[in-house]
Design a protein with these regions (language model features):
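Vicinal oxygen chelate
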Residues: 1-5, 85-125
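N-terminal beta-strand motif that seeds the catalytic metal site of vicinal oxygen chelate
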Residues: 1-20, 66-68, 121-125
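A short, glycine- and basic residue-enriched loop/turn
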Residues: 13, 40-41, 106
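Conserved active-site tyrosine of GNAT-family acetyltransferases
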Residues: 22-27, 82, 114
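Short secondary-structure junctions
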Residues: 31-36, 89-93
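Conserved short beta-strand elements that form part of the metal-binding/catalytic scaffold
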Residues: 33-66, 116-122
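Mid-chain, well-packed structural core segment of small domains
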Residues: 71-87, 91
Length: 125
């Protein structure tokens, strides 16, 4: 039996234009725990997954970003709380899928560096 080459996702990197502005957004608005930062990077802990904000080393890395789906318990309450912290949302919380008695809700937002991310919540219907 072949074992998996990839064991797990250990870190997600997000390119930023202004590290201090991004650091404030992820720490103060999203409430992530800052592990440490340098002049060009900041590392956060998010329930066992490390999130790295980085000033791109090369121009070709400046635009590459993935959507990060942040799981929350109550998407509507979290949405309202983050609106109060002036987080810019692209839409409102909405159902994207229903599997049996479980609904998957999402709402997309922009960080201060123009990266798109989302809140995700699975709710018993």
């Amino acid at each position: 039996m072949e074992t998996n080459i990839i064991q797990k996702i250990g870190q997600i990197g997000v390119p930023v234009k202004d590290l201090n502005r991004a650091l404030d957004f992820y720490k103060e608005k999203l409430g992530l725990s800052l592990l440490f930062n340098t002049n060009s990077m900041a590392f956060f802990e998010c329930n066992g997954l490390r999130l790295m904000l980085t000033l791109p080393e090369k121009e070709e890395f400046a635009l590459s970003s993935s959507v990060i789906y942040f799981e929350v318990n109550n998407i509507k309450d979290t949405y309202e709380r983050l609106l109060g912290k002036e987080v810019t949302f692209i839409d409102e919380p909405h159902v994207v899928a229903k599997m049996g008695q479980t609904e998957t809700w999402m709402v997309f937002f922009k960080d201060t560096e123009d990266n798109t991310h989302a809140l995700l919540s699975e709710v018993e219907a």
